[in-house]
Amino acid sequence: MAGAKEIRSKIASVQNTQKITKAMEMVAASKMRKSQDRMAASRPYAETMRKVIGHLANGNLEYKHPYLEERDVKRVGYLVVSTDRGLCGGLNINLFKKLLADMKAWSDKGVQCELAMIGSKGVSFFNSVGGNVVAQVTGMGDNPSLSELIGPVKVMLQAYDEGRLDKLYIVSNKFINTMSQVPTITQLLPLPASEDDDLKRKAWDYLYEPDPKALLDTLLRRYVESQVYQGVVENLASEQAARMVAMKAATDNGGSLIKELQLVYNKARQASITQELTEIVSGAAAV
């Protein structure tokens, strides 16, 4: 059994770690609320844009934009949103597992995959396991802007425009609540038709002013950008929620460990006292 002094040192070490995890839990809770505010502010725009695009995809258009046309799939692209920092439980690895399974399904069909990474954890993971990473951006902080994301988005859209990609997906964590974040893979291009049954039963005709090509070029790019930005802010809220939960679990586990160490310390102390008393009694008997 370890000595009382050694056990006291372990207890002090766990207590110091517990203070750190508690502080990180509180910081994550504060950042999560701010991230939720940003997510709530951007969500109406992203959802409205998705509805508008759903109308377009179901419509009888006088100009059929390339982003609306299905192609034979030979190569797919993924915009992968991960975190820049760790200590957020299984948030990243669960996302990567889902992505790897989807990539394998395409690979089994003879389809090649390209990756554009947002977040350093995704970059380091696919550098280690292997993956065709064609673009990346890291270190965006807690308040990302669209201008920081535009690099990977532009690379993937250019590849799609040039016919080097036939499908484009965004991979990110969807924030449900503090305890639940779901890894999702959402198709961006070609634009998926709306799932609304009312829209499916109707035929839509549009008139464009001044020019359908110029309008759709701008509108559809804005759509992709809005979905990527929404994915990033939701992933950020998911990160802070997962970190808060992970740090709370670490703090609670630290408390349990301290109780166990305290019990071991008491037993060690009791054994030490018993040994001292035995030695005293033995010495007195010898006299």
Swiss-Prot record:
Subcellular location: Cell inner membrane
GO molecular function, one term: ATP binding
The keyword GTP-binding is annotated on this UniProt entry: no
Keyword Cell membrane: yes
SUPFAM superfamilies (UniProt xref): ATP synthase (F1-ATPase), gamma subunit
Keyword annotations from UniProtKB, A to Z: ATP synthesis, Cell inner membrane, Cell membrane, CF(1), Hydrogen ion transport, Ion transport, Membrane, Transport
Membrane-protein topology: Peripheral membrane protein
Alphabetical GO biological process terms: proton motive force-driven ATP synthesis; proton motive force-driven plasma membrane ATP synthesis
Signal peptide (from-to): none
Primary location: membrane
Domain of life: Bacteria
A single GO cellular-component term on record: proton-transporting ATP synthase complex
Record-stated family: Belongs to the ATPase gamma chain family.
Function comment: Produces ATP from ADP in the presence of a proton gradient across the membrane. The gamma chain is believed to be important in regulating ATPase activity and the flow of protons through the CF(0) complex.
Subunit structure: F-type ATPases have 2 components, CF(1) - the catalytic core - and CF(0) - the membrane proton channel. CF(1) has five subunits: alpha(3), beta(3), gamma(1), delta(1), epsilon(1). CF(0) has three main subunits: a, b and c.
Protein name per its UniProtKB record: ATP synthase gamma chain
